[in-house]
């Protein structure tokens, strides 16, 4: 596989099980927003990773998460990569870590989750992408980083 020595991917130090970027230099640094970025472009690109619908359901009503969305909206290229699919949202809470006896008590429905995700795109300008798995999300993150790195590099050369 090709190595991209000019691109150093920043992994937030709080990321507990980070993606492996074997073809890139990786630096672990505390990011103000998001879980991943590109060294030297930390104010331009950020990727927030969400592992499960349960994680989204837990975050969705928290003021702290709204603050994250507002910070993400300040980036030129803000992304939320979802390590699950649309079908997982539509079936929620099936497949979640919530005990079955609690399902009737939850107030967060698939419709509520989807409404909020659409708002993240429309209100905040954040690219929200269903990736179906962690592996797919990592692969997509690599493509995003390459594309944005070279797009920004070309833009600087034209200045």
How should each PLM-predicted stretch be described?
Residues 27-33, 37-159:
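Extended, alpha-helix-rich binding/interface surfaces that flank or overlap catalytic cores
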Residues 1-41:
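Acidic-basic catalytic patches of nuclease active cores, encompassing PD-(D/E)XK
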